[in-house]
Amino acid sequence: MFKGSIVAIVTPFKGGEVDEECYRELIEFQINNGTGAIVPCGTTGESATLSMTEHGRVIDIALDAVKGRIPVIAGAGGNSTQEAIQLTKHAKEAGADATLQVTPYYNKPTQEGLYQHFKSIADAVPLPQVIYNVPGRTGVNMLPETVARLAALPEVVAIKEASGNLGQMAEILNLAGDKITLLSGDDNLTLPVLALGGKGVISVIANIVPKDSADMVKAWEDRDISKAKELFYKLLPLSQAMFYESNPIPVKTSLSLMGRIDGEMRLPLAPMSSTNRERLAKVLKDYGLI
């Protein structure tokens, strides 16, 4: 369940509402191109701007569309432990295979606070957790020692690591590699993370090039290092372009330019600037996507 290219899928909007038909089409596109699992309602899915009702509905649509063909890892995190528990309960009741649990953001808990947060979710809902460290967004960095403590809990099975710190990721595996699966949280570090002992990536670029992302990880698994490197460096300009502006602005703009979604976002996310849109379009054109 926790390996390969896992897509942090966008949430398409149309006229201010979730575009269910388009969402289902995106999920089919992923499954047909080798994606290993779907993560609805993550950062890339604009979970922060979804109401609780919408959040639940997006998870339900994803599960109905996937129909058990690949795992669904439902985004269920929050900066309120009780809210995260509520979202996790819904994910379990709906039939999700696991949840993605981001470290609480804005309130900047201590390492003990982080441990108690994830433990409380595990105690309340017996469902596998992929814990998610992304200090650039949350304002708090979960240290390897804390991850190792959490790895002792049966529900905590994997970590999406987006600190950008390979030394920190190596220490996680050094302390708890036999108990927890490491997944890259950054497309531009997927190959280095695999080399450390990681098992895959929760990917943004898989939204637009799912097959190449999946093939890269598969090549590494097959010990075809040359092919894995070739695909990694082919993908690198796309990985970098996905952060010309805040995620998911570039990836939704890319999908719009490719004709797959409307490209609508919710405030406070605004449309991409014309300058960056031109830069992005060039990268997509060079890749052969438009």
What name fits each language-model region?
Residues M1-V7, T11-G139:
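Active-site beta->alpha loop and helix N-cap motifs at the rims of alpha/beta catalytic domains
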Residues G4-P12, F29, N33-T35, A195-G198, ...:
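C-terminal alpha-helical cap/extension of soluble enzyme domains
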Residues G15, E20, M52, P144, ...:
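Alpha-helix N-capping/helix-start residues
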Residues D123, R137-S239, F243:
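Catalytic alpha/beta core domains of metabolic enzymes, predominantly
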Residues N133, E155-V156, R266-L267:
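Glycine-rich phosphate-binding "P-loop"
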